């Protein structure tokens, strides 16, 4: 049996094996023969501890003083002391038993078994069983100031509205949900991923969580959301390899690097650097940018940033789970699949790094990437073939209610497209290379034998970001047409009819519209955004992380201001901080009218309009069922 007390848990014996110090937080590692400790220190009044027991035994935790533990709406259990001068403890999630492989991917997990409970006077203890060939994980917070525990008790509607995650496409609904992702000091994807059925590290998940908690901190003013952000930053820096990379091993049992996840780490570090200027964050960022800048392919027209390290050579591609076509389109290496979204995101990330740090060593690389992007998007061979082809394939993107109205011959063509034409598309693209299709659909890549209709909205999100980062550097008619196609055909409704793993696309549609609203004043984008927010609510996805206005790529930290926050649980908001002025979109997802009550009001003078753009009074502001209002302020 391994036995310890709550007090002793937070005072590990011996010196720390390693320590990471940031501007506002510190992480220290301690190790005994059977237990690993990861201790995060924030203010003097707040600590978080990850405990990992790595041998088959019973783990006994004693509580030597009088405490009352109660279940929290925020998640987990809060322990309040009888002695008001003693610290409080928060256990956000139940202890878990896990199996991990050599790369620390999680291959199995279940809630730990409580093997015993002892109560003697003011002393109590709880025992958990760690089985053979397993580890036992426990996460616990220690607070020494009452205001922190009061924040957990006073949750508002916005605390619980739910946030969509860019990595796992899951939803975090309450504070304790963080620790389903942040495990033993590292951020994991929530899914047991195809094809090896294991939970892998995910900086994409970390970036979404960081953005979500930045927004919730701004919306609520609660200190623990800032602690969550700092803990995520520590976790990302902890995982960075000596060569500057973040490795994942998702598709193979080797440690391949997924560059989209790598650039998510860069964006997260840039968010934190923009806020704090922390030298340690900058050091990790510099190393990460240097790594990703080297991993590109030389096309005839310019450089192309790769999607993952399997694309470095044909042998690595063959070790992965995909079927692919070996082609040298545009002079690319055969193993480069010409994946659009990661190339766009990496270009945005390195350009953002230049703007933030004034380090211009990658300027020529970015210029070259812009040329290759423009070239790839402008590929338009064989219109005579692609126009009828994507008219037919477009029929498969109609929601069922529209498809049922088609004439019988058209429905037959739809079936042929689904059963045959889509399967032939990779070979057609190999003969006539093209990403942007005549009807407005944008394909994910050029050379994989896959069909990823769910990536349409990811492409739109990244192109919307790209258009803001590089105005005039590509034909925005491509983006405008693709946005209109996605909305007008009913593709968003079609997504909810697809397999569960494909429905997430609506969450990225919201992100795309958010960025488009920041760039354009068109009312239609606000209308589309309101509808998309309703769709995400109805599907249980939560709201996109950027909507609370704290995505620092879109709105630098210095420009993020306080805004009015409704207290109604029926309402969701989108905060649009544009150079031309502030906008607040409020959407009522209920089936009844709602009068807006305010959790927080500001001094800002706001003019309100309803969904038909008619002015309305801010006195007893009413929103009809399934409708929205838009406020503008300066």
Range-by-range predicted roles:
Residues 31, 35-53, 565-605:
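Carbohydrate-binding surface patches
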Residues 8, 14-85:
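Long, solvent-exposed N-terminal ectodomains/accessory regions
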Residues 248-285, 289, 332-333, 339-351, ...:
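Aromatic-rich carbohydrate-recognition surfaces in CAZymes
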Residues 132-139, 143-152, 616-634:
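C-terminal beta-strand-rich structural cap/linker in extracellular carbohydrate-active enzymes
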Residues 541-579:
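Glycan-recognition and catalytic regions of carbohydrate-active enzymes
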Residues 207-223, 264-280, 345-360, 457-473, ...:
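Well-ordered alpha-helical scaffold segments within catalytic/enzyme domains
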Residues 59-130, 607-612:
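Trp/Gly-enriched beta-strand surface patches
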Residues 161-199, 223-246, 282-306, 312-326, ...:
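Long, well-ordered core segments of solenoidal/helical folds
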């Amino acid at each position: 049996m391994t036995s310890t007390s709550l007090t002793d848990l937070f005072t590990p014996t011996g010196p720390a094996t390693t320590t990471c110090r940031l501007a506002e937080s510190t992480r220290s590692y301690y190790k005994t023969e059977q237990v690993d400790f990861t201790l995060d220190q924030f203010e003097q009044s707040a600590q978080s501890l990850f405990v990992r027991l790595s041998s088959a035994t019973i783990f006994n935790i004693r509580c030597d003083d009088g405490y009352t533990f109660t279940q929290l709406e925020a998640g987990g259990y809060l322990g309040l002391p009888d002695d008001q001068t003693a610290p409080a403890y928060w256990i956000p999630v139940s202890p878990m038993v896990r199996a991990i492989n050599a790369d620390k991917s999680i291959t199995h997990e279940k809630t730990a078994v409580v093997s015993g409970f002892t109560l003697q006077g003011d002393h109590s203890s709880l025992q958990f069983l760690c089985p053979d060939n397993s580890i036992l994980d426990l996460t616990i917070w220690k607070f020494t100031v009452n205001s922190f525990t009061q924040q957990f008790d006073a949750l508002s509607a916005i605390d619980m509205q739910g946030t969509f995650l860019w990595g796992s496409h899951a939803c975090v609904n309450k504070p304790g949900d963080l620790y389903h992702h942040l495990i033993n000091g590292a951020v994991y994807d929530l899914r047991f991923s195809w094809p090896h059925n294991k939970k892998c590290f995910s900086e994409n998940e970390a970036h979404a969580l960081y953005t979500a908690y930045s927004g919730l901190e701004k919306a609520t003013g609660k200190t623990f959301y800032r602690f969550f952000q700092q803990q995520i930053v520590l976790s990302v820096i902890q995982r960075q390899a000596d060569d500057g990379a973040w490795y994942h091993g998702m598709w193979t049992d080797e440690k391949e690097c997924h560059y989209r996840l790598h650039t998510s780490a860069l964006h997260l570090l840039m968010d934190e650097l923009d806020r704090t200027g922390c030298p340690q964050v900058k050091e990790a960022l510099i190393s990460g940018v240097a790594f990703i800048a080297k991993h590109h392919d030389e096309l005839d027209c310019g450089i192309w940033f790769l999607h993952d390290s399997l694309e470095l050579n044909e042998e690595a591609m063959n070790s992965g789970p995909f079927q692919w076509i070996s082609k040298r389109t545009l002079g690319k290496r055969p193993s480069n699949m010409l994946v659009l979204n990661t190339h766009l995101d990496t270009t945005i990330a390195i350009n953002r790094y230049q703007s933030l740090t004034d380090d211009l060593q990658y300027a020529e690389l970015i210029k070259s990437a812009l040329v290759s992007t423009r070239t790839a998007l402008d590929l338009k061979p064989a219109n005579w073939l692609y126009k009828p082809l994507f008219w037919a394939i477009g029929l498969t993107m109609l929601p069922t209610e529209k498809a049922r109205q088609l004439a019988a011959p058209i429905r037959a063509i739809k079936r042929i497209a689904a059963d045959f034409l889509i399967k032939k598309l990779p070979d057609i693209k190999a003969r006539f290379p093209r990403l942007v299709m005549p009807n407005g659909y944008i394909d994910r890549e050029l050379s994989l034998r896959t069909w990823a209709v769910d990536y349409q909205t990811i492409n739109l999100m990244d192109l919307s970001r790209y258009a803001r980062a590089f105005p005039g550097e590509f034909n925005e008619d491509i983006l405008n047409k693709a946005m209109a196609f996605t909305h007008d055909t009913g593709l968003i409704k079609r997504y909810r009819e697809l397999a569960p793993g494909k429905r997430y696309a609506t969450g990225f549609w919201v992100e795309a519209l958010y960025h488009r609203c920041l760039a354009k004043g068109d009312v239609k984008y606000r209308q589309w955004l309101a509808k998309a927010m309703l769709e995400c609510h109805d599907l249980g996805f939560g709201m996109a992380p950027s909507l609370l206005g704290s995505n620092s790529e879109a709105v630098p930290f210095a420009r993020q201001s306080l805004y009015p926050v409704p207290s109604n649980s029926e309402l969701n908001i989108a905060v649009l901080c544009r150079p031309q002025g502030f906008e607040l979109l409020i959407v009522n997802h209920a089936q009844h009218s709602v009068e807006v009550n305010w959790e927080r009001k500001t001094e800002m003078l706001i003019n309100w309009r309803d969904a038909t753009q008619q002015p309305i009074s801010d006195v007893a502001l009413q929103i009809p069922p399934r409708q929205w209002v838009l406020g503008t302020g300066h």
